[in-house]
Amino acid sequence: MPKLEQFEIKKYWQIFSGLKPVENKVSHDQVLPILYNSKLDSSILNKIWFLADIDDDDNLDFEEFVICMRLIFDMVNKNIDSVPDELPEWLVPGSKAKLIKERQKAKQQENAEIPRQEVPDVDWYISPEDKTYYEKILSTCGPMADGTVTFAELSLALKSKFFNIGVSDMERTWKLINPRDLPSIDRDPAMYFIHCLRQRNDIGTSIPSELPPALAEVCNKQRVEYDLSSKQADLKRLDTKEPTKNDVTKLGDELDRLEHSLENLTTGSTSSTLQGTIKMSKESLNQFKGLLAFMENDLNHPNPDSNANVKYVTDDLDNIDQQVQMLETYLQQKRQELGSLKAEVGST
């Protein structure tokens, strides 16, 4: 922004005099035609007027008028991209310097008195009601052949429901939920994708940079492919022994113990919310049992011509063992919740 030249000041004086100032001042109404002729947005003109009216009397003396005209011409001629928040020192008249400092001090005090609003964090708990709502959204997405959903399908479904989020919010959340950068994600990560963006839209939560450990395991979970011709079936595990019937029996015992714990927890529970989450856990357990039966059949009827079949079962055994451990941890948490609920009921 070039500094004021003498010819500019003369030009501004001619304009100022033509407005017929009263007591060496012009009002906002007198300057209004000049403001409108600039074709600048009203928000820009208001900011220029605020900066120029240093003594805040809704009138401009000649020194203030010079400031107003210079900022308008700089914006019109694109010498500056935006109106500055504060006047540059070379544009501040010497007679107004004290007023400028007082205005800046008052502004700082005003900002200090305004309490800062903390941005809330994402609450990753999905209630049964939330789950039902997210399932309805997912039902509108066109799933892939393997049941997964793409970013394009999810973002298209959410654009018509969440109006306070942009593409950048969706992309950041997608990278968070999909750390392996897969072309599509499973149903569970997709629900957390919707859950995070819903809170961003409704209450302005910040999108975190990383997931909680338990949720990270869900989003990083290796997909189980049942197609023996897939690439996953060809993976080599040099440090893994071939599975035996003892391995399957051991896994079956763990599943039986887990099912027994779930039944005990269900019998003693007094919370409808807890009942809902236990039902979800039972559904997962039934899926594991079905997969166990599938693997037992593979072991009882092996295909001698396919080494991929053996490696496939080995991979799945390791995968299910990890998920059983996660469910046991989950059960322990629910037992603690049940104990708290019983204590509350006993104290009433």
Curated annotation (Swiss-Prot):
GO cellular component entries: actin cortical patch; actin cytoskeleton-regulatory complex; endosome membrane; plasma membrane
Chief localization: membrane
PANTHER family the record matches: EH DOMAIN (PTHR11216)
Transmembrane portions of the chain: none
Membrane topology of the entry: Peripheral membrane protein
Subcellular location, record wording: Cell membrane; Endosome membrane; Cytoplasm, Cytoskeleton, Actin patch
Keyword Zinc (UniProt): no
InterPro entries (alphabetical): EF-hand-dom_pair, EF_Hand_1_Ca_BS, EF_hand_dom, EH_dom, End3
Occurrences of domain EF-hand (ranges): 40-75, 146-164
Biological process according to GO: actin filament organization; ascospore wall assembly; endocytosis; endosomal transport; reticulophagy
Assembly, per entry: Component of the PAN1 actin cytoskeleton-regulatory complex.
Pfam families: EH, End3
Gene: END3
Name the record gives this protein: Actin cytoskeleton-regulatory complex protein END3
Domain EH positions: 8-98, 130-222
Coiled coil: 244-345
Function comment: Component of the PAN1 actin cytoskeleton-regulatory complex required for the internalization of endosomes during actin-coupled endocytosis. The complex links the site of endocytosis to the cell membrane-associated actin cytoskeleton. Mediates uptake of external molecules and vacuolar degradation of plasma membrane proteins. Plays a role in the proper organization of the cell membrane-associated actin cytoskeleton and promotes its destabilization.
Keyword check for Cytoplasm: yes
Organism annotation: Candida glabrata (strain ATCC 2001 / BCRC 20586 / JCM 3761 / NBRC 0622 / NRRL Y-65 / CBS 138)
One function term, GO molecular function aspect: calcium ion binding
Domain of life: Eukaryota
Protein keywords: Actin-binding, Calcium, Cell membrane, Coiled coil, Cytoplasm, Cytoskeleton, Endocytosis, Endosome, Membrane, Metal-binding, Repeat
Residues reported to bind Ca(2+): D53, D55, D57, N59, E64
Family of the protein in this entry: Belongs to the END3 family.
